[in-house]
Structure formats: C-alpha cells, structure tokens
Amino acid sequence: MASEVTSAKAVAKTVRIAPRKARIVIDLIRGKQVGEAIAILKYTPRSASPIIEKVLKSAIANAEHNYDLDINNLVVEEAFVDEGPTLKRFRPRAQGRASAINKRTSHITVVVSEVKEG
C-alpha cells in the first residue's frame, strides 16, 4: 500500500526581513484556505506580505505540479518563520564611536495540505 502525499512545502531562506516582523504577518494566514490567505496577504500593508505571498504561491504550485493536489481544497497547515544568519554592520557615531547594527534575516516555511471533503 503506497502512502498518498497530501501536503506540499515551500521554503524561502535568508530573506532580508526581521523574523519578528515576518511572524506578525505569518500568524494571519495559518490555518486558512489558500485563496483566503492570498487575499489577506494582498491587502496587508506590511513589508513581509509580498515575500510570504510568494512563498505561499510556491507551495501551492508545488502541491499542484509535484503531487497533483486540488488547489481548491488546500489549507495552510503550517506556516512559521525561523531566524536566519544575522548580518552585522556598524554605524559611525559622534566622537569616533561606532554602534553595532544587526540586519536580521529569516527562513520562511509554508506547508499546504489537502483537506478531504466528507
């Protein structure tokens, strides 16, 4: 008996957005139908929205192309943001000093799964 795949995943690594800011947006789509999730992301005025929308669309495309899943029955099963490598920079300050600036990056993961009707 072959196990049937009912979920697909997409990951964007080392995206130049702070994980804390991306998590605010990713919390909005977790558990939603994919059509509703795309609509939410399209009208959310946050810098993370287009990035997460792109990852979600990639997961949907993976589900359709790789596993022949029905797009109309897909739900965002998992959506999370992990911290990527931090780029460390310095900003010159007064009197010869310098302040550290941490440019944080994120790893964004979205898993969509097919919900069986009935």
UniProtKB/Swiss-Prot annotation:
Keywords in alphabetical order: Ribonucleoprotein, Ribosomal protein, RNA-binding, rRNA-binding
GO MF entry, a single one: rRNA binding
Gene3D superfamilies: Ribosomal protein L22/L17
GO cellular component: cytosolic large ribosomal subunit
Gene Ontology biological-process annotations: translation
CDD domains: Ribosomal_L22 (cd00336)
Pfam families linked to this entry: Ribosomal_L22
PROSITE patterns: RIBOSOMAL_L22 (PS00464)
Function: This protein binds specifically to 23S rRNA; its binding is stimulated by other ribosomal proteins, e.g. L4, L17, and L20. It is important during the early stages of 50S assembly. It makes multiple contacts with different domains of the 23S rRNA in the assembled 50S subunit and ribosome. The globular domain of the protein is located near the polypeptide exit tunnel on the outside of the subunit, while an extended beta-hairpin is found that lines the wall of the exit tunnel in the center of the 70S ribosome.
Subunit structure comment from the entry: Part of the 50S ribosomal subunit.
Family statement drawn from the similarity comment of this UniProt entry: Belongs to the universal ribosomal protein uL22 family.
Protein's name in the database: Large ribosomal subunit protein uL22
Gene: rplV
